Amino acid sequence: MGKLIDKTIDNSYANELKKQCPSSDMASVTVNIDPETSMVFDNQYYKNLVVHKGLFQSDSVLLNDDSTRKFVEDFANDQELFFESWDQSFMKLTSVGVKTGDEGEIRRICGATNA
């Protein structure tokens, strides 16, 4: 049985992903999150989402709700707005701090708690 393809993805993009990913479940296969400008920090990923070429289903569903669709469309249409928002978010994230000891742990393997 073949793998199911998200019907909301652009057909040409889905076909390209099928070419890049073998039918076996090989964990070593990687694809670019943004095939257009993969080595550049820009708003292209949002542009891709708007035309249904998002790699992650969790991002693609942002278009399903009016409140989140507006953010995707605004970031796709205004790179400076995206940069400003990213800058503010990144600065907030740097002030969170690392929880250690009884409050948390830094995992050696992301998908598993330290034993």
Map each language-model feature to its residues.
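Catalytic cores of secreted/periplasmic or lumenal enzymes
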Residues: 1-115
